[in-house]
Amino acid sequence: IEVPHKELDYETVYLDEFKGNADKEKYQLAIYDTNHILIDILKDRKSSTIREFLLCHKDSIKKVGMDMFMQFRNTVYSCLPHADIVADKYHVIRQANWMIRDVRIRLFNSDIKYREYKKYWKLIAKNPNSAFSPSQKKRLKKLKNLSEIFSRAYDLRTKFFSIFEIKDVTIFSYELKNLIGELKESGIKECIKLGETLSNWEEEINNIQKYNINNGFVEGKNNKIKVIKRLSYGIKKFDNLKKLIQLRIS
């Protein structure tokens, strides 16, 4: 079966791993172009495999969108020192959600008086800048009054979400740097950890607003890949999996 040829634009490429379980490798890597067209499926996510692809297109690639996987970042910078990496917004925001989750779990495991942090986990996990009903606002206020640690962590997460609504790149960068400082100085271990993560990825996070690109479209592509694998009864040979994905997604 011949895969149809399409014109590809390599100026921006997006890297995204998925669980393919092919040829004894748990993960494979999908690569998409500027227009979200599938470029290639790599047999694994090893640095040597990614390096081979990047070096083949080093003169064309200017920006790389990716999740917050240090191995990917190190490989991209070593092959493409002049390219800009753009962190995926979804994965960045998830870091803040993990922070409040870990604070919540630590507290309700430490004392029975914090059991409501377990009961109302959905309310706590909700986007803090979304609409809350009067009863939800009242409950959230009670939850914050239970613990200064939780209240401070929740407020910092709220500020984090608010920063991503800023469109001006300079202001975004300024507010992000301030937030990182607040997180590191909070005295809350989960917040400090988040601050360190954001600091390590600060340039790539700033590039989210600078270039206004993200890997959001990849979720739909991954869902299609999952369907392909399910309908093919968990195809195990990589070459067959690759051709099938290229036919269905390209």
Annotate each language-model stretch with its function.
Residues 117-185:
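Helix-loop elements that line ligand-binding/catalytic pockets
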Residues 67-71, 77-121, 219:
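Conserved beta-strand -> loop -> alpha-helix junction used to position metal-binding or nucleic-acid-contacting
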Residues 85, 192-194, 199-250:
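Amphipathic alpha-helical/coiled-coil segments positioned at domain termini
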Residues 111-125, 237-250:
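Charge-dense polyanion-binding interfaces
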Residues 1-75, 82:
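RNase H-like nuclease fold core
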Residues 162, 166-216:
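Amphipathic alpha-helical
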